[in-house]
Amino acid sequence: ETGADIITHESFRMFFDPTEPDDVDVETAATPRVPFGDTPWGGPGHSLPWRRKMYYKGSSRFPTLFRAPKPTIRLAEGEHISLAGREWMAIHTPGHTEDHLCLFDPEAGVMLCGDHVLPTITPHISGMTKNVDPLKGFFDSLDKVGAFGSQVKISLPAHGLPFENLALRCDQIKEHHVGRLDKLRVVASELDKPLTVTEYSGHLF
């Protein structure tokens, strides 16, 4: 251990860790944490490599051996925290994950945008959420950080190089998704029959 703080949003949970805090409601605690069953969109379950399956099963049987580092600081939307001599504001940005968190330094105009906004690719939008429309939630989060406009001078992503004009990149990502949705509508109209997510993917890629 290094003693470094691990900062997360207040709702952060490790879905495969049965040793998470006791404040989780009974229904959630009773729900299997590993996505071996049906997917949220109704298709067949994931087929994981045997090594990965053994890891997940081991983590539930021997939690002390597989325990992930615990967050030491949990932040709510709009909370401020001092890091490395800078004052950062927490921005909750559900989309890639339900508990994704960005940090903004208004004095220097620096946005730590993590996996929320990436410069050359679009983040995966998780279906492992209670949100009935996670893509809409992602769009709302893009609008939230995009609204900072020129206040953001530089954005630091989790993948790729630092980039400028965060608001423009947010618009580009939304346009990409809208284009994909339009293509799905065309496919649905042409085939005129129900399709699974897997079948739709075959027409998209």
Identify the residue ranges that each predicted region occupies.
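Short acidic, hydrophobic short linear motifs in intrinsically disordered regions
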Residues: 191-205
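Active-site HxH/HxHxD metal-binding segment of metal-dependent hydrolases
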Residues: 1-82, 169-171
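Metallo-beta-lactamase
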Residues: 50-73, 87-181, 187
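Short glycine/proline-enriched coil/turn segments at helix->beta-strand junctions
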Residues: 2-4, 106-108, 193
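Generic structural signal for secondary-structure transition and capping sites
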Residues: 21, 147-150, 193
